[in-house]
C-alpha cells in the first residue's frame, strides 16, 4: 500500500471517529425525535406539540452578560494573612446563568422606588404582594444616613444630602440597602418583566432575577480563569502604566490613587473575561448564601448554596427575629487589596445597611450551555 493512501485512510478514520463522538454529544443537531404531523394520533408526542406552543429561546436580559457553565476550584487563590481558614479550595461545577454587567445603580434603584412611591400612590403588579408605602420606606428605601453612621468623625453630610438622588450620582452604585431590600428588588424586577411579557403577546415567563450564590459570584468574578487572584487575572493591582485596576484603598489613609475618594461610576475600570465590571472594589456585593465559616466543605459540589436552617421556618420563610449573617464579596472603595481577591469571604447581617455594600442580580439560564450559543 502506498504511503499516501495509508494517510488518506487514517485521516478518513479519524474524521469518522470525531463525527461519531460529537454526534453522541448532541453537537451536530442529532437527538431530537423525528415523526409525522403535529397531531397526537394516538401517540405520545408531547403536550407542546398538541397545543402547538412556540419554542423557548431565552433572551439575554437587558444589562446582563451570559456566563457559561463550567468547573473551577473555589477558595483562596493566595495566602490567608489573617489565618481565617474559612475558604479551603474545593472543585465545584456552576450551571449557566446571566449576571448584571455592573452593580445596580442609583438610577436603576430609583425606578424601583418610584414604582412603589410614585405620585399616584404606587402601582401594583399581578400576583405580587402589596406593600404599603410605610413598610416600603422602612425596609426597602435606601438609608442615606449610612455616610454618617458608618464612619466616626467623618464629614459625610454632602453624601447624605446628594448621593442617593442627585443626577450627578445616578450612574454610581446604590448603597444603604440591606440584603432584604436587594432580595425584594430581584422579586419586583422579575414580576415587572414577566407582566410585560404576558401583556405583550403572552410570552412565557423568564426565570427569576435573584442575588447570585456565593459560588456563582466567585466563578463569575474569575472570568473563566480557574485560580485567578483578582478578576483581571494577574496578581497585581496596577497595570503596566501604573494605573490602579479597581476602586479600593491602596494604602494607609490613601483612598484617591485610583481616581475616586469614595465610590466610582459603574463601568469605569476594565471588565474581566466574562465582561463583568467592578467585581473587585467600588462596593461589596450581597450574595444569596447565609454565612457559615465552614460552609465550603459542607455544601455540595454542584451549584452549592449554604442555607442556615435555624434562620427559616418549616415552610422556608425567613424568621424575622433571626438576624442571619449573609455573605458579601468583592471588597469596596474603603477596603485594602486583600478583600478584593476573588476568594476572600466576609459577611454582614441581613438587615444591615452600609455605605460600602451594594448588589447585582443573576438569572438562571434554562437549558444546556456550552458557551457556544453566545458567540
Predicted regions mapped to residue ranges:
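Generic hydrophobic-segment detector
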Residues: 15-16, 60, 65, 86, ...
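Bacterial Sec-dependent N-terminal signal peptides
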Residues: 1-36, 220
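Extended beta-strand/loop cores of jelly-roll/beta-sandwich
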Residues: 6, 25-215, 325, 345-375
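Functional-site microenvironments in short loops/helix caps that host divalent-cation chemistry
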Residues: 37-45, 67, 73, 78, ...
Amino acid at each position: 500500500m502506498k504511503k499516501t493512501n495509508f494517510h488518506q485512510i487514517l485521516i478518513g478514520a479519524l474524521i469518522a471517529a470525531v463525527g461519531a463522538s460529537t454526534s453522541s454529544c448532541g453537537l451536530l443537531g442529532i437527538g431530537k425525535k423525528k415523526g409525522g404531523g403535529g397531531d397526537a394520533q394516538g401517540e405520545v408526542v408531547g403536550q407542546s406539540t398538541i397545543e402547538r406552543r412556540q419554542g423557548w429561546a431565552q433572551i439575554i436580559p437587558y444589562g446582563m452578560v451570559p456566563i457559561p457553565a463550567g468547573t473551577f476550584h473555589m477558595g483562596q487563590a493566595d495566602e490567608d494573612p489573617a489565618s481565617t481558614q474559612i475558604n479551603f479550595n474545593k472543585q465545584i461545577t456552576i450551571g449557566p446563568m446571566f449576571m448584571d454587567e455592573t452593580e445596580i445603580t442609583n438610577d436603576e434603584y430609583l425606578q424601583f422606588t418610584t414604582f412603589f412611591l410614585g405620585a399616584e400612590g404606587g402601582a401594583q403588579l399581578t400576583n405580587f404582594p402589596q406593600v404599603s408605602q410605610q413598610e416600603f420606606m422602612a425596609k426597602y428605601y435606601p438609608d442615606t444616613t449610612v455616610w454618617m453612621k458608618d464612619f466616626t468623625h467623618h464629614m459625610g453630610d454632602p453624601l447624605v444630602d446628594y448621593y442617593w438622588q442627585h443626577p450627578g450620582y445616578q450612574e454610581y452604585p446604590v448603597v444603604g440597602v440591606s440584603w432584604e431590600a436587594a432580595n425584594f428588588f430581584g422579586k419586583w424586577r422579575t414580576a415587572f418583566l414577566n407582566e410585560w411579557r404576558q401583556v405583550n403577546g403572552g410570552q412565557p415567563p423568564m426565570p427569576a432575577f435573584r442575588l447570585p450564590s456565593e459560588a456563582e459570584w466567585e466563578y463569575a468574578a474569575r472570568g473563566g480563569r480557574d485560580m485567578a487572584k483578582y478578576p483581571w487575572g494577574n496578581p497585581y493591582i496596577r497595570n503596566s502604566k501604573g494605573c490602579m485596576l479597581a476602586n479600593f484603598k491602596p494604602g494607609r489613609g490613601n483612598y484617591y490613587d485610583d481616581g475616586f475618594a469614595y465610590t466610582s461610576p459603574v463601568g469605569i475600570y476594565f471588565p474581566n473575561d466574562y465582561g463583568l465590571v467592578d467585581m473587585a472594589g467600588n462596593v461589596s456585593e450581597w450574595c444569596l448564601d447565609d454565612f457559615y465559616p465552614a460552609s465550603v466543605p459542607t455544601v455540595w459540589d454542584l451549584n452549592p448554596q449554604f442555607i442556615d436552617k435555624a434562620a427559616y421556618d418549616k415552610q422556608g420563610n425567613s424568621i424575622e427575629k433571626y438576624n442571619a449573617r449573609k455573605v458579601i464579596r468583592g471588597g469596596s472603595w474603603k477596603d485594602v487589596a486583600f478583600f478584593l481577591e476573588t476568594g476572600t469571604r466576609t459577611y454582614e447581617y441581613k438587615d444591615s445597611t452600609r455605605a460600602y455594600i451594594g448588589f447585582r442580580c443573576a438569572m438562571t439560564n434554562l437549558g444546556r450551555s456550552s458557551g457556544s450559543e453566545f458567540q
